[in-house]
């Protein structure tokens, strides 16, 4: 099993699909990485040589922000918004939808399970 960017990549899958297991690499970046390294998209991970795996690893380290670094940057951006006291930061702090969705009904995923209200019956 190949290990790239601290993630065990499944060996039986195609390289383009397997690279998506890394946080921060989606379909577009996976295809882009394969083109840069010169690996055909149909090639399976278990067919890669050690040199090709090393080349993929170096390309990702050099050109892309993935896994822990990406998660850290995202959380720092959210923390910055909260410290600024912006509207978006306030919504994050209150665990409400940030991008303008309605909250009168719905938004249960963001708000958590419904709280029981005493005396509220239909």
UniProtKB/Swiss-Prot annotation:
One GO CC term on file:
cytosol
> What GO molecular function terms would the record report?
rRNA binding; structural constituent of ribosome; tRNA binding
Pfam families attached to this UniProt entry: Ribosomal_S13
Xref: InterPro entries: Rbsml_uS13_C (IPR027437), Ribosomal_uS13 (IPR001892), Ribosomal_uS13-like_H2TH (IPR010979), Ribosomal_uS13_bac-type (IPR019980), Ribosomal_uS13_CS (IPR018269)
Q: Which domain of life is it from?
A: Bacteria
Q: Where is this region: Disordered?
A: 97-122
Cysteine-cysteine disulfides? none
Keywords from the UniProt entry = Ribonucleoprotein, Ribosomal protein, RNA-binding, rRNA-binding, tRNA-binding
User: What does the entry give for GO biological process?
Assistant: translation
Gene3D superfamilies linked to this entry: 1.10.8.50, 30s ribosomal protein s13, domain 2
**Family (UniProt):** Belongs to the universal ribosomal protein uS13 family.
On assembly, the entry states: Part of the 30S ribosomal subunit. Forms a loose heterodimer with protein S19. Forms two bridges to the 50S subunit in the 70S ribosome.
**Protein function:** Located at the top of the head of the 30S subunit, it contacts several helices of the 16S rRNA. In the 70S ribosome it contacts the 23S rRNA (bridge B1a) and protein L5 of the 50S subunit (bridge B1b), connecting the 2 subunits; these bridges are implicated in subunit movement. Contacts the tRNAs in the A and P-sites.
Query: What is this protein's name?
Result: Small ribosomal subunit protein uS13
